[in-house]
Amino acid sequence: MRLIILGAPGAGKGTQAEYLSSRFGIPHISTGDILRENVKNQTELGKKAKEYMDKGLLVPDEIVIEIVKNRLMQDDCKNGFLLDGFPRTIAQAEALEKVLADLGQKIDKVLNIEVPDEKILERMSGRRICKSCGASFHVVYRPPKKEGICDICGGQLYQREDDKEETVKKRLEVYHAQTQPLIEYYKNKGLLVTAVGQEEIADTTKEVLKALGVE
């Protein structure tokens, strides 16, 4: 199975991607991860990407596509893969199609995990992380016994910059503006399937399998 997984930040996409990867025995390819890996290993493409990343700029499509292509050519992708974080734009989607056509492959399905913005806002802005041990709590769903204090090590809990309400709202805005055209693009190609994210991870997994036609 060759899958693309879409979902807003905080929609639980990573967790589902890991599950599907082990269920189908296909690699979970996170573009962010392979980009960082190339930078760390100082590959030619990694060096080029780093120049942009160091300036806080987006890495150009041609570099990202080349990095993704190299990853898709590895042996473990022969029987399928799960792409996460790519494509983000229609231009990238078209480039990916060309790459796959060269490899004699095509995308089977594009899975979109849908969670209402207000739900994501509640999930993310309620998260609290321990400064000492990194344990994660939630003011509504998993509150610490003592406010602001970690149950595990007694460390201080804090809210990450990424989880602040204004930041989350901005990230969601950017995500929708960028991804909506992509969702339409794959819908028109008859590849899009949608799973509605639930409160419980296991319930979301059920929705995901149903959307993919796997029980």
UniProtKB/Swiss-Prot annotation:
Q: Cellular component per GO?
A: cytoplasm
Enzyme Commission number(s): 2.7.4.3
Ordered alphabetically, the record's keywords are: ATP-binding, Cytoplasm, Kinase, Metal-binding, Nucleotide biosynthesis, Nucleotide-binding, Transferase, Zinc
**Quaternary structure and interacting proteins, as annotated:** Monomer.
Q: What is known of its domains?
A: Consists of three domains, a large central CORE domain and two small peripheral domains, NMPbind and LID, which undergo movements during catalysis. The LID domain closes over the site of phosphoryl transfer upon ATP binding. Assembling and dissambling the active center during each catalytic cycle provides an effective means to prevent ATP hydrolysis. Some bacteria have evolved a zinc-coordinating structure that stabilizes the LID domain.
What does this chain do?
Answer: Catalyzes the reversible transfer of the terminal phosphate group between ATP and AMP. Plays an important role in cellular energy homeostasis and in adenine nucleotide metabolism.
The name under which this protein is listed is Adenylate kinase
Q: Which organism is it from?
A: Caldicellulosiruptor saccharolyticus (strain ATCC 43494 / DSM 8903 / Tp8T 6331)
Q: Which gene encodes it?
A: adk
